[in-house]
Amino acid sequence: MLRTHLSGELRKENAGQSVTLTGWVNRRRDHGGVIFIDLRDRTGIAQVVFRNEDVAERAHALRSEFVLRVTGVVEERPEGSQNPNLASGDIEVSVTEFEVLNESAPLPFQIEDSSSAGEVGEETRLKYRYLDLRRPVQANALRLRSAANKAARTVLDSHDFTEIETPTLTRSTPEGARDFLVPARLRPGTFYALPQSPQLFKQLLQVAGMERYYQIARCYRDEDFRADRQPEFTQLDVEMSFVDQDDVIALGEEIISEVWKLIGYEIKTPIPRMTYADAMRRYGSDKPDLRFDIEITECTEFFQDTTFRVFKNEYVGAVVMTGGASQPRRQLDAWQEWAKQRGAKGLAYILVGEDGELSGPVAKNITDAERAGIAAHVGAQPGDCIFFAAGDTKSSRALLGAARGEIAKKLDLIKEGDWAFTWIVDAPMFEPAADATASGDVALGNSKWTAVHHAFTSPKPEFLDNFDTNPGDALAYAYDIVCNGNEIGGGSIRIHQRDVQERVFEVMGITGEEAREKFGFLLDAFAFGAPPHGGIAFGWDRIVSLLGGFDSIRDVIAFPKSGGGIDPLTDAPAAITPQQRKEAGIDAKPKPKAEAQAEAQAEESAEK
């Protein structure tokens, strides 16, 4: 090794020892001819001092991010010069000799000054990601991710799970987003697809009798740009045979609990459960943030005889902003712009005065009886503001759900270090295909119905006989785990019977011929004694970003893409040459399947 010790691990107990350190120049200071350098390695910083005239003279040429190897004696710092902000702040190393292992060009941004991090554009940070990762906060994010991987593996290994890698070159099968396609050079005109998830392979592993599988899996989805999404991402993927929903949830809680211990937080288990219907009714979201106690109050029945045209609608609901009646007019106008940015016409409101009198546009248009009872109906007190949404149920609840989150921010109801977990169960099995398309997803099949989770989720047992006759009423045997308003994992009990799977395909408008073409290998496997099975997948990037307190998952990915799937570091994606295009067979017409199979068999025979 080029060093004997690590910079961040030196202590007073090392005083008097001769040590050799290696690392980067984090900061350089010149005090009257004596050079002080903060030497940084992966463990932290140690102050090294160049007092000797020979070494001090040479040290004048050192600059930020030069790579050094220094040898010297550990000394206790003089009284009053200790640095309590450094683990090694009680000592310094008096340098007797040093070697410049490499120099650094002028930096595109300062590394040692963490306060400037917010001033550096993200494109620049990602272009020079190898420099960005020298910052302790960024480097520690990757170390936290590694620790989370280890914690999850420890739990799963203790339950006799087997870690198995599944293919990343497979066939294109519809799973809810567009596939990334890879040309197969040896079969011109045909393409592999990168997997959107290991879903089908992990189910096949259950058919194979593995019973307990897991994988930290890379997944790929060619989606339109959405904030804080990545075209390639990681999930902790788990599948088990001979289990029910409670078994998978219990294991999921054990994994999450162990991971959150990394930041010193003890999750209380069992984690509460909430039905999808309750979540939408009370919070306007299937991933509610429960760190604050604001709920939606349904007012549809209250206003059933109203003369106010706006409230003559399918749905009317409200949320209360405590103390909101004191908001100035410009803030109330800002709420209207906020709502319009979310596709609504506005956000109706009533102000409850300190004397209990109601004011605002809505108060002027409702009946005396409605004015007399609305505050009590929604639980508003003098000084509060009542916000309303009216229209179709889904979009109105979504607007109120977003409003409760905005209210919580404005009232500072979310405290740092608060954690709130819940399971969302009993979600619909199918949704209108138009709704899926409107939200940016790919609606599978050619029907007015598509799967909410995916096509391989089993209906709850009570809907097994009639889910195809009443798709809109069927509930899925599925469960999602939500943390602080973020979905961090989701799973389901899977279909393991061929006839049930074929019925689901029929509901989604996937014909028997198309099902055999796309999923024939899975349907065939179900004919050979597939066991009941279920599983869960955790969004690992999201979990680590929450653990580390990061706003974006990009901060916990070593080399993330920026908006639109661009990699500023390598400038990917990039054009290919005409020769590459020709060799890849992108424009070739694929041979008939039978002919291609015959050629493949002939090639195999020739090799033997």
From Swiss-Prot:
Region (Aspartate): 199-202
SUPFAM superfamilies: Class II aaRS and biotin synthetases, GAD domain-like, Nucleic acid-binding proteins
InterPro entries, per the entry: Aa-tRNA-synt_II, aa-tRNA-synth_II, aa-tRNA-synth_II/BPL/LPL, Asp-tRNA-ligase_1, Asp-tRNA-ligase_1_N, Asp/Asn-tRNA-synth_IIb, AspRS_core, GAD-like_sf
Residues reported to bind ATP: R221, D222, E223, Q230, E487, G539, W540, D541, R542
Enzyme Commission numbers on file: 6.1.1.23
Reactions performed catalytically: tRNA(Asx) + L-aspartate + ATP = L-aspartyl-tRNA(Asx) + AMP + diphosphate
Subcellular location: Cytoplasm
Major place of residence: cytoplasm
HAMAP family referenced in this protein's UniProt entry, alphabetically: Asp_tRNA_synth_type1
Record family assignment: Belongs to the class-II aminoacyl-tRNA synthetase family. Type 1 subfamily.
Quaternary assembly: Homodimer.
Functional note: Aspartyl-tRNA synthetase with relaxed tRNA specificity since it is able to aspartylate not only its cognate tRNA(Asp) but also tRNA(Asn). Reaction proceeds in two steps: L-aspartate is first activated by ATP to form Asp-AMP and then transferred to the acceptor end of tRNA(Asp/Asn).
Record protein name field: Aspartate--tRNA(Asp/Asn) ligase
Organism: Corynebacterium glutamicum (strain R)
